[in-house]
Swiss-Prot record:
BP term (GO), one: positive regulation of MAPK cascade
This protein's name: D(1A) dopamine receptor
Compartment list: Cell membrane; Endoplasmic reticulum membrane; Cell projection, Cilium membrane; Cell projection, Dendrite
Primary residence: membrane
Cystine pairings recorded for this chain: 96-186
PANTHER family in UniProt: ADRENERGIC RECEPTOR-RELATED G-PROTEIN COUPLED RECEPTOR, D(1A) DOPAMINE RECEPTOR
Extracellular side: 1-23, 88-96, 164-192, 300-312
One GO cellular component, as annotated: ciliary membrane
Amino acid sequence: MRTLNTSTMEGTGLVAERDFSFRILTACFLSLLILSTLLGNTLVCAAVIRFRHLRSKVTNFFVISLAVSDLLVAVLVMPWKAVAEIAGFWPFGSFCNIWVAFDIMCSTASILNLCVISVDRYWAISSPFRYERKMTPKAAFILISVAWTLSVLISFIPVQLSWHKAKPTGPSEGNATSLGKTINNCDSSLSRTYAISSSLISFYIPVAIMIVTYTRIYRIAQKQIRRISALERAAVHAKNCQTTTGNGNPMECSQPESSFKMSFKRETKVLKTLSVIMGVFVCCWLPFFILNCMVPFCGSGETKPFCIDSITFDVFVWFGWANSSLNPIIYAFNADFRKAFSTLLGCYRLCPTTNNAIETVSINNNGAVVFSSHHEPRGSISKDCNVVYLIPHAVGSSEGLKKEEAVGIAKPLEKLSPALSVILDYDTDVSLEKIQPITQNGQHPT
């Protein structure tokens, strides 16, 4: 009997030790996630406050709004849930309802800001002239206000009026709801109506809009890349055909295959860029919103096909919040923000780089497909050399359009096509006064 008691005590101690180790690992992982989210989004906000040129671009207003929503996720949502995960119960009592409202509001605001960014970039690429006229700071603030207002309406009003909770079906469940849900944990059961309606507004409708906009952006970029490739091949072909042999006879000339390979490479890079944007977002949030719509339909029978354990649900909740730590890397890691981050962190002085040539592809704020290549010698500040191919009918941003050096740079290729401009210097803008609207066939109107 004494041996049996000793074995039982040893088994209990082993389980407790494993549970303690698991809690420590969980605490470390969640702390790193919260700190990375705080650091990334704080850097974005600090860069915008510190550098005036970042505030001058209307598109960055949406990036700032996204960073604020993600920062609120890291401050108002993540820490409280992390403490509950480590402690094994909800220790904050009646703060539960307010926390649930903050959770829904901040997460919805983050997703809606991502949707607004996708619409903004599509509009800038598809209708650049109209975008320059219509997308003023006032228009940007209106879009941002709509996103935040919708987030508040879908969160605080239903939660404070208890519209979001599922009604208890029996006395025992009612007691558990009134006691356990408030004191022991904060995993409130959503009603079916609220779960579906909030999921539609917070995720399914925005993700559908993002899929449509980014698909169209890729198609526009693909057409422009192929048009540019055709112009490059025509230029090389014409140059080769003008070369003569020693006796004055023209040499045989052929279309270069390298241009086709470069075109395919550029299309692949654009596709990868857009795939990362959508892939990260969908992978982080889709599992949670699927479960969010399934759990309210969890029955009381033996099979319970829509029921899952709380640990699985919490894991996918954290997957969704993790998207807030990745957004600064995806949306605020262009050349402007990278230089601002390097200045804020002192990396120009403390982080010397080796010789390295890096080529990246992106779609900039002006609606252009950008193939950037920068050479970074050791111990010096990196100098970007970007080749920007403007989408047909697209022009540069109106901010700072006073420099005219780009006109001289673009002249050689303007002879090939008035729809094409090449900018070799990142800091050089294209003057709207020097570029006339073009028709569908690529000619200036007469």
